[in-house]
Amino acid sequence: HIEDGVALTKFLYWIKTLKKLNLTEQKVEKKLENFRKQNKNYLYPSFDTIAGTGPNGAIIHYRSNKQSNRKINKNDLLLIDSGGQYKWGTTDVTRTICFSNVSKKIKELFTRVLKGHIAVAQCDIKKDQVGHNVDKKARQSLNKIGLDYRHGTGHGVGFFLNVHEGPQSISKNNYVKLEQGMVVSNEPGYYLENKFGIRIENLVFIKKNNNKLSFENLTFAPIDKDLIEKKMLNKKEVKWLNNYHRLVFKKLSKYMNKKELVLLKESCSNI
């Protein structure tokens, strides 16, 4: 997961510092794949990369083709859902990024998705708790304003096996008990048809701590702070985000060149 975080973070530096966004979705997919290929332990994608910009980002299981392959516009959000198969395991990560100032509404929606992501990450797993119970926490902030998303909050992930692997998941209809050692995704989102998509995804590991189960993050990559409305986050959420970014910097910084390190430091600074 650290190796995958290095590839994704180097890609994010590359795309964020381009002088001209002369790119299409398929070029983005190939470029990210090239960054992963630089690692000798990388074997192949764990699934077809989703790179959806603007309205294509609102298609939950989007796959680009010759007809849909959209140019990247600096005024649109870009949703990138990707993963790799490495000798040491399987990754799956989603980041949503922007290239210019965004509206207050988009910031609000992104922050509500982030609040859901943090709610799952901070969740204590009670005895015999099932995925259905955790799923509610992820949707709470969106539900407060009458919004939701049409997919599960998380799916099980195998170890150099299937990137979607049961029986565990975090979803409305899953009643499988969450147990120590399971890996699941944490990926709430929001999608406005024909406009944009937002998703934040990390993989998490269920660990035992003082006779309690909790989630430990496995994914290390910056979350775009330009999309966050800080005043919507409570103190615990701000602390979680700052601690997460501190850990991202600690895990990845030694693999960055000088220019990449400058952006990583800024991306991981406190809000």
Predicted regions: what they are:
Residues 1-271:
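Active-site neighborhoods and metal-handling regions in enzymes and metal-associated proteins
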